[in-house]
Amino acid sequence: MILVTGGLGFIGAHTVRALASLGQRCLAATRSPVPDPAPFADLGDMVTVVQAGAADLSSLRRAGDGRRVSGIVHLAAPAPGPPGERAAFVRASVDALLNLLDGAAAWGVPRVFLASSLGVYQGVPDTPYREDARLRQLPIDPIPAAKNAIELLAAVVTQSAGPQVVNLRIATIWGPGNTSRAPVVPNLVHAAVRGEPVQQPVYAADGSDLCYVADCARAIALLQCAETLHHSTYNVGCGRPASPAQVRDALLRSIPGAALELTPGRDPGGPGHDTWLDITRLRQDTGYQPAYDLDRGLREYIGWLRGGHPY
């Protein structure tokens, strides 16, 4: 049974389904009370949903003890909060890491996957970003900073004993279930489907690795199911850049006439070039290939929203 923290979240819920499709029974953990009716009812006994927070050792151990947990995929993440409350964010992030490693030791789990971020590459000059790039220690945003720190702490804790820890440096993910309008794709898709204005300036030329959530989930599931992994860090994305202008053009093929106003050029506060991930390691060790291009993913996403889902 694979424990997936954040198992009802955006990426987590899709990952649970991807694992189940590969024959893996899942324990989907959520900090919130389990909804009624429980999610994943269509998957029967392949998925069990439990209330457990990774930063709460007692609830985590109650969830996993006696359940033959054989793998851990840690996708839950605390919200950073305002600048004056960042200590609580850091504490929750570190507590979750240590609790999961404690659980892995108690349950005999050989491998723990930790969700990291494309953001750890901030300041790296060369693209595509490779896992062996030398990361820059910059005053970066709190979430990438925490992800970078957790990667280092996990390596220290498991250096001589403990499970294999695998870092997942995840691209910008989009698709059904994303509650945030901040990323480029949900912003433009909601504007097109709802007939609303585009929120905030979106610079037309800023290309980045925009990976459809089903592809991301399948990549994580393939890594979890791989017998052997040759690396401790994997980029997870589609391995190519796409710009907001390309997203707009693809949307107009599905929703002709949608009013999608973009700001010309690149964000003056951005890196000044396209950013995307090298996914060679992922491909070599799992055989992964993205199944969704922009047009296919957008058609599915549009259909989801038009089917009555709020996000």
Task: Give residue spans per PLM region.
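Active-site segment of SDR-like NAD(P)-dependent oxidoreductases
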Residues: 78-80, 118-127, 171-174
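NAD(P)-dependent short-chain dehydrogenase/reductase
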Residues: 127, 152-208, 213-215, 221, ...
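SDR active-site strand-loop-helix element
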Residues: 5, 29, 72-76, 112-118, ...
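C-terminal substrate-binding subdomain of Rossmann-fold SDR/epimerase-dehydratase oxidoreductases
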Residues: 196, 200-311
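N-terminal Rossmann-fold cofactor-binding loop
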Residues: 29-34, 54
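Catalytic helix-loop patch of NAD(P)-dependent Rossmann-fold dehydrogenases
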Residues: 87, 91, 95-99, 106, ...
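N-terminal Rossmann NAD(P)H-binding glycine-rich loop of SDR-like oxidoreductase domains
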Residues: 2-22
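NAD(P)H-binding glycine-rich loop region in Rossmannoid oxidoreductase-like domains
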Residues: 51-92
